[in-house]
Amino acid sequence: MNNLTNPSKLALNSSLTKTGRRKTSIATVQLFPGNGEFTINGISGIEYMQQKEELIFAIQEPLHFLKLKNEFNLIIKVKGGGLVGQVNAIKLGIARALCEFDLTYRNSLKLKGFLTRDPRCKERKKYGLKKARKAPQFSKR
C-alpha cells in the first residue's frame, strides 16, 4: 500500500489495490488515474462481459454515482463464480478502492449500499435430503 502525502490525490504512477467478494467470486481491483478504460483478466472489460450493457454499467456504477467515470483506469483480476457474481465482486472492490482514494466518498457510497458485502452463498446439501432443503416425498401408508 502506498503512503500518500495527500490522501485525496493519487500520484500518476501509483495505484490502489482492493479486493471484493460475492458468492464464490473473488475480484482484485487496481485503480489508476486515467481515462475510464478497464480490463478484466487481460481482456477489454466490454469484451469480457460479452457486450452486455447492464453488466458493464453495473461494474461502473460506483464511478457513475460519484461522477468519476473518466477519471480512473481499472485493471481487474477475477476468478470463480458466474458473470453476475463476478460483477458484484468487482463493484465492491471498486467501491473499496474509491474509499481508500478519498475518505469523503465513504458516506455516500455506504448510503447507496456499494460498501456492503452480500453474505448470501449457496447452502450446502444435507444428508437424507435430495438438495439443501428438498426432502424425499413422504408417504403415510
Swiss-Prot record:
It holds the Pfam family Ribosomal_S9. It comes from the Eukaryota. SUPFAM superfamilies: Ribosomal protein S5 domain 2-like. This is Small ribosomal subunit protein uS9c. It is found in: Plastid, Chloroplast. InterPro entries: Ribosomal_Su5_D2-typ_SF, Ribosomal_uS9, Ribosomal_uS9_bac/plastid, Ribosomal_uS9_CS, Ribsml_uS5_D2-typ_fold_subgr. The keyword Chloroplast applies. GO terms for molecular function: RNA binding; structural constituent of ribosome. The gene is rps9. The keyword Chloroplast applies. Belongs to the universal ribosomal protein uS9 family. GO terms for cellular component: chloroplast; small ribosomal subunit. Gene3D superfamilies: 3.30.230.10. GO terms for biological process: translation.
